């Protein structure tokens, strides 16, 4: 059967279970779609996951980009057969106890193991690292953050990025310009951060600025309002995305929206309005999760905006190692030692607060 040539579109969608239904195949063949995000509900075991990703990639050319939230700690979508990854706060604790060098070495190993294991299963991208500072205010961020110190966050994230690259993956820093100061969970509410731009510049923005300079491939903005800067949430704000992120910081990579079905996004109107505002604000790609009916609504008669850079930006997020090469790496004693080291960093406390961060079973 001839594989249709369909340029990747501007929507990243999801699927319901372990295999594609015929309805999902037709949805993923739509030109509006460019990628698929997987969740815990899509994972039964490694063999099944490999079959699923192969099935998705066989649908069209260029292949759909496959992503997952697989950060470590309480946000690790795939467990059985994968190395249990520590919460990123564990790396911050190493920074405080044993120094920067030891923590950066550990972060590099975590990134390498994380990416290689996913690459072996046909995954292109994990939405990581979290660049939010741990101000002690935000339970949904909490131990997902490396540290409260911007320098520590930036250096540990950069070390993790280098590890990801060894495993064939690019980085995606989130949640721009910082979700750690607010108390609310943007999956459930629309939080507000009342600080000034100068206060944000002095702290939360620093890791994004440094990582942009060091080759961070993608950014995901927060569904948070910063009223002293703009009355719109960052992901819907031209001030944040076009002026501050693109112009002032100089970020050249991909901007993914956070999930447009989250409560923090719903105030912008229906799904077509949310997508339109996201694109006008500067997002390249929008995530629409857990609501296939809304993906279908976007497909029906929504005018997808022209984005000349889209094809190049999508391709930049594709895995660079490949499944077969990653599987070969996993057989080496060096990599197996790295797996053992990383597993030794994880602990039951890493999952404190529950695993269902942005998850739907």
Curated annotation (Swiss-Prot):
The active-site annotation reads 187, 258
On whether Cell wall biogenesis/degradation is a keyword of this UniProt record, the answer is: yes
* Residues carrying the site annotation Important for catalytic activity: 185
A GO molecular function for this record? beta-N-acetylhexosaminidase activity
Protein residues bound to substrate: 69, 77, 144, 174-175
Classification via InterPro entries: Beta_hexosaminidase_bac, Glyco_hydro_3_AS, Glyco_hydro_3_N, Glyco_hydro_3_N_sf, Glycoside_hydrolase_SF, NagZ_Beta-hexosaminidase
Concerning Pfam families, the annotation shows: Glyco_hydro_3 (PF00933)
Q: Which domain of life is it from?
A: Bacteria
Keyword set for this entry?
Cell cycle, Cell division, Cell shape, Cell wall biogenesis/degradation, Cytoplasm, Glycosidase, Hydrolase, Peptidoglycan synthesis
* Pathways involved: Cell wall biogenesis; peptidoglycan recycling
A GO-annotated cellular component:
cytoplasm
Q: Which GO terms describe its biological process?
A: carbohydrate metabolic process; cell division; cell wall organization; peptidoglycan biosynthetic process; peptidoglycan turnover; regulation of cell shape
EC number of the protein: 3.2.1.52
Catalytic reaction annotation: Hydrolysis of terminal non-reducing N-acetyl-D-hexosamine residues in N-acetyl-beta-D-hexosaminides
- What is the uppermost EC class here? hydrolase
Where found?
Cytoplasm
Concerning its family, UniProt says: Belongs to the glycosyl hydrolase 3 family. NagZ subfamily.
Cite the NCBIfam families for this sequence: PRK05337.1 (NF003740)
Q: What does this protein do?
A: Plays a role in peptidoglycan recycling by cleaving the terminal beta-1,4-linked N-acetylglucosamine (GlcNAc) from peptide-linked peptidoglycan fragments, giving rise to free GlcNAc, anhydro-N-acetylmuramic acid and anhydro-N-acetylmuramic acid-linked peptides.
**Name of the protein in its database record:** Beta-hexosaminidase
| Organism per entry | Neisseria meningitidis serogroup C (strain 053442)
Lineage of source species: Bacteria, Pseudomonadati, Pseudomonadota, Betaproteobacteria, Neisseriales
């Amino acid at each position: 059967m001839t594989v249709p040539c369909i340029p990747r579109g501007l929507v990243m969608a999801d699927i319901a279970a372990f295999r594609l239904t015929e309805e999902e195949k037709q949805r993923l063949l739509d030109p509006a779609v460019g990628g698929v995000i997987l969740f815990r509900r899509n994972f039964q075991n490694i063999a099944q996951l490999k079959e699923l990703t192969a099935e998705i990639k066989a649908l069209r050319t260029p292949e759909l980009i496959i992503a997952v939230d697989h950060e470590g700690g309480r946000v690790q979508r795939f467990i059985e057969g994968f190395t249990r990854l520590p919460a990123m706060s564990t790396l911050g604790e190493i920074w405080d106890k044993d120094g920067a060098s030891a923590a950066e070495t550990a972060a590099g190993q975590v990134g390498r193991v994380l990416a290689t294991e996913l690459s072996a299963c046909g995954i292109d991208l994990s939405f990581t690292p979290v660049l939010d500072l741990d101000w002690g205010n935000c339970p949904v961020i909490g131990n997902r953050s490396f540290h409260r110190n911007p320098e520590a966050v930036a250096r540990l994230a950069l070390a993790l990025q280098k590890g990801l690259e060894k495993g064939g993956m690019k980085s995606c820093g989130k949640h721009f310009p910082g979700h750690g100061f607010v108390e609310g969970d943007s999956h459930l509410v629309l939080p507000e951060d009342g600080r000034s731009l100068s206060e944000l510049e002095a702290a939360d923005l620093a890791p994004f600025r440094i990582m942009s300079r060091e080759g961070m491939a993608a950014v995901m903005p927060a569904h948070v309002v910063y009223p002293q800067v703009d009355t719109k949430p960052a992901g819907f704000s031209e001030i944040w995305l076009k002026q501050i992120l693109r112009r002032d910081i100089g970020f050249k990579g991909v901007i993914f929206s956070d999930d447009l079905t989250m409560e923090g996004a719903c105030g912008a109107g229906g799904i077509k309005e949310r997508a339109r505002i996201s694109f006008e604000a500067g997002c390249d790609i929008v995530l629409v999760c857990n609501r296939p009916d809304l993906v279908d609504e976007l497909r029906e008669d929504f005018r997808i905006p022209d984005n000349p850079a889209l094809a190049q930006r999508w391709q930049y997020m594709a895995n660079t190692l490949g499944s077969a090469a990653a599987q070969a790496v996993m057989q080496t004693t060096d990599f197996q030692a790295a797996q053992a080291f990383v597993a030794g960093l994880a602990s039951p406390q890493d999952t404190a607060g529950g695993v269902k961060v942005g998850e739907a079973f």
